[in-house]
Amino acid sequence: MAKKSMIEREKKRERLVAQYAAKRAELKEIANDESRPMEERFKARLKLAKLPRNSSATRLHNRCQLTGRPHAYYRKLKVSRIMLRELGSAGQIPGMVKSSW
């Protein structure tokens, strides 16, 4: 299980990304619009740089919803490979059966 501080840090990042998503998108649109004056675009870049680092979506890391494990994450189920195996063996995931050949 991941440290609680790491799980909370990731939750905080998710909140910040959601909070600043609209503002960040607006500033990016202004900064990348070549029809606008260069000075206005530069000011938008400066404002974008002043936003909190953790408000950027690229800083998010997928974590298992049950354990907080950051590696071997299955996006579709939002769990790690270990929990996928445990839940699958326990019959908690509909349609998943243990393979045999």
UniProtKB/Swiss-Prot annotation:
InterPro entries: Ribosomal_uS14, Ribosomal_uS14_bac/plastid, Ribosomal_uS14_CS. One of its GO terms (cellular component) is small ribosomal subunit. It comes from the Bacteria. Coiled coil: none annotated. One of its GO terms (molecular function) is rRNA binding. The keyword Nucleotidyltransferase does not apply. Keywords: Ribonucleoprotein, Ribosomal protein, RNA-binding, rRNA-binding. Belongs to the universal ribosomal protein uS14 family. HAMAP family: Ribosomal_uS14_1. Part of the 30S ribosomal subunit. Contacts proteins S3 and S10. Binds 16S rRNA, required for the assembly of 30S particles and may also be responsible for determining the conformation of the 16S rRNA at the A site. This is Small ribosomal subunit protein uS14. It comes from Ruegeria pomeroyi (strain ATCC 700808 / DSM 15171 / DSS-3). The lineage of its organism: Bacteria, Pseudomonadati, Pseudomonadota, Alphaproteobacteria, Rhodobacterales. The gene is rpsN.
